[in-house]
Amino acid sequence: MIALGGASGACLRFFISESMLKLLGRGFPFGTLAVNILGSLLMGILYGLLDKDIIAESPAKALIGVGFLGALTTFSTFSMDSLLLLQQGHFIKMALNIILNVMVCIFMAWLGLQLVMQKG
């Protein structure tokens, strides 16, 4: 279950990252930010569905939470992107990357949870 979810999440991450690179260029790690934002929103939704017993915990948590979302999102790439921006002297971009990845992703996880919890 985890491997199946992981393979799907990794493929989507690659597609999104490559698409963002082609669309917006290399000046800022938009691909990493995009997958982390999407993954955070989906994790909030998953947590809400699990909390309300709408989906079964073990299979969904393994397939979606650990596998798919674990492979889709990436803390290591976020860390490396931030380090490279620092080494290149792009201090404002580095700070923006850190702030956006942390604050926006936390907000999106909260939003995903709220979307589920407010229904019924």
Swiss-Prot record:
GO terms for molecular function: fluoride channel activity; metal ion binding. Na(+) is not transported, but it plays an essential structural role and its presence is essential for fluoride channel function. GO terms for biological process: cellular detoxification of fluoride. It catalyses: fluoride(in) = fluoride(out). Na(+) binds at G70, T73. One of its GO terms (cellular component) is plasma membrane. It is a multi-pass membrane protein. InterPro entries: FluC. The chain crosses the membrane at residues 30-50, 66-86, 96-116. Pfam families: CRCB. It is found in: Cell inner membrane. Signal peptide: none annotated. Keywords: Cell inner membrane, Cell membrane, Ion channel, Ion transport, Membrane, Metal-binding, Sodium, Transmembrane, Transmembrane helix, Transport. NCBIfam families: crcB, PRK14200.1. Belongs to the fluoride channel Fluc/FEX (TC 1.A.43) family. Fluoride-specific ion channel. Important for reducing fluoride concentration in the cell, thus reducing its toxicity. PANTHER family: FLUORIDE EXPORT PROTEIN 1-RELATED. This is Fluoride-specific ion channel FluC.
